[in-house]
């Protein structure tokens, strides 16, 4: 009887491990493994396998809890909006104090971490939800290519490397390589995640559906799984 129970426990443990590995492999095959040379060496590139069979990408941010996300620069103020006076300003500039810490907004894997032309020191994270975020002009990157990071993890120190006139974080949100206004997803005035469903077509057209938040959205780190 004791031997039978031991065998049963072992079988359950192996089954659980296999299921967990299968979930992880499925998650990684979506966006997070086998980066190409282009993905390793460019801040902007398409995300393979992002769209479903109908050609849509969907992410429901209303279901995220306080542990699933973080504002990139806590206490920061937007000093230059998306677009703005510069026609091709593809993100927002967030200003705070010198040597402040920049945090990963969602969990995911570091796809890029090195200098890139006018961006200076840059970090690009491909997230479990399929989005990518970019953080640049960093004085120092705290993460390396291939690292897995969780929401709220320190990833860089604010700086003014590259084409920058003051210490700040240039922050971008990209879906399939296309930049979208971060204010669609984050209320930057009060540092909150917007409770929205994001729908993007393969042509790049975006639709934002406002929803009621299911739970609180105050910052705190942890990983979530892929949106379906």
Task: List each model region and its residues.
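Soluble periplasmic/extracytoplasmic beta-strand elements of cell-envelope proteins
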Residues: 77-79, 91-93, 122-124, 134, ...
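Conserved positions in beta-strands of structured domains
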Residues: 79, 95, 109-114, 139, ...
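Solvent-exposed coil/turn segments that connect beta secondary-structure elements
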Residues: 83-85, 97-99, 107, 115, ...
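Short, well-structured beta-strand-loop connectors
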Residues: 101-111, 143-158
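Conserved, short, structured surface segments that act as functional micro-motifs
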Residues: 127, 147-208, 216
């Amino acid at each position: 009887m004791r031997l039978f129970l031991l065998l049963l426990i072992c079988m359950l443990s192996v089954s659980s491990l296999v299921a967990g590995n299968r979930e992880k492999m499925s998650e990684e095959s979506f966006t997070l493994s086998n980066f190409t040379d282009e993905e390793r060496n460019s801040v902007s590139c398409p995300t393979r396998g992002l769209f479903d069979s109908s050609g849509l990408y969907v992410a429901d941010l209303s279901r995220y809890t306080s542990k699933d996300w973080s504002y990139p620069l806590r206490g920061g103020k937007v000093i230059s909006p998306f677009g703005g006076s510069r026609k091709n300003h593809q993100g927002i500039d967030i200003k705070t104090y010198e040597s402040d810490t920049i945090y990963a907004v969602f969990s995911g894997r570091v796809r890029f971490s090195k200098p890139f032309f006018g961006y200076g020191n840059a970090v690009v994270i491909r997230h479990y939800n399929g989005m990518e975020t970019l953080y640049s002009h960093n004085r120092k990157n705290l993460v390396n290519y291939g690292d897995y990071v969780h929401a709220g993890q320190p990833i860089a120190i604010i700086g003014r490397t590259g084409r920058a006139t003051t210490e700040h974080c240039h922050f971008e949100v990209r879906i399939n390589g296309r930049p979208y206004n971060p204010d669609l997803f984050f209320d930057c005035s009060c540092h909150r995640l917007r409770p929205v469903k994001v729908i993007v077509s393969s042509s790049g057209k975006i639709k934002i559906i406002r929803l009621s938040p299911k739970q609180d959205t105050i910052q705190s780190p942890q990983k979530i799984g892929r949106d379906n």
